[in-house]
């Protein structure tokens, strides 16, 4: 009641306030009615529309903020909004025909045509010659296998092998796809075309341009990955590592060095000294380790690189934390390096826990 006895004037509550959204529900209802005069518009239609637009706006702003942070900028610009949309598969599909003013363009860069201006972030071996390529069989030689696979069993076997090889190379953009003894469990495409693939296999059998070997300052090869590579590469691989240790000296934390992949399907092995969990700035150093490995691969113009789960073995990183940091480092590297020669990054895993974590973290990579 007012002082004169009349009713107190009540303030009108807007439709947006009633629905609990910020975007103007009443205005959207007018726009919908204006464009569709023949149809009956439900009360919930503008509310749902406002909620969806509000969610999309918040999502784009969050991703644009991440892009600005990765580019070390303190203000979000239209360029960052364009990068945010392009880096999210669903948003990119939704806003494919939309032009963002002052956002620039996403060039289709061929790394082979660009001069390398950025210096290496890790220590390099002076001169490394990759192992000689295997001699191809002459076309005159007859293949007895073709004769032996006659009948239903042979046809069934060749069909099964064909399916395996198709599944292996379906999403790969590299010239040398991995061998048949593996399974691609998940694939993620980044906005500049690079592909991330979770692979269940033995890392020593992966036919990529480079494989990553987590080690220590003394190039120790007694860990899980090192032992596997030593078993496959044999004496030549061990001698190459010893020679690298002699030339390079102790490997600093987060540092990386490369040697030839003697006895391995991979041309090169990138040795990296990852930090120990609990050490000072260990998370930052793990990201730096991954970026240094990628930088070495770029310096050699390699197209594919295979990572194990760095840091989650003897160095004690929780598997999920290690996966998050590694994926974040890779995504950040490709955002800041527009001229990368790397087309495919493999995550070579063997245990179900690591596989599940990487598949899960890769699925929400854009949101992070």
Swiss-Prot record:
Crosslink (Glycyl lysine isopeptide (Lys-Gly) (interchain with G-Cter in SUMO2)) position: 123, 166, 188, 319
Cross-link (Glycyl lysine isopeptide (Lys-Gly) (interchain with G-Cter in ubiquitin)): 116-117
Modified residues (N6-lactoyllysine): 7, 9
A single MF term (Gene Ontology): transcription cis-regulatory region binding
Modified residues (N6-acetyllysine): 116, 123
InterPro entries: Core_histone_macro-H2A, Histone-fold, Histone_H2A, Histone_H2A/H2B/H3, Histone_H2A_C, Macro_dom, Macro_dom-like, Macro_H2A
Keywords: Acetylation, Chromatin regulator, Chromosome, DNA-binding, Isopeptide bond, Methylation, Nucleosome core, Nucleus, Phosphoprotein, Ubl conjugation
N6-methyllysine: residues bearing it: 18
Post-translational modification: Monoubiquitinated at either Lys-116 or Lys-117. May also be polyubiquitinated. Ubiquitination is mediated by the CUL3/SPOP E3 complex and does not promote proteasomal degradation. Instead, it is required for enrichment in inactive X chromosome chromatin.
Biased composition (Basic residues): 144-159
Domain called Macro: residue spans: 183-366
Coiled coil: none
Complex and partners: The nucleosome is a histone octamer containing two molecules each of H2A, H2B, H3 and H4 assembled in one H3-H4 heterotetramer and two H2A-H2B heterodimers. Interacts with HDAC1 and HDAC2. Interacts with SPOP. Part of a complex consisting of MACROH2A1, CUL3 and SPOP.
Similarity comment: Belongs to the histone H2A family.
Protein's UniProt name: Core histone macro-H2A.1
Gene source species: Rattus norvegicus (Rat)
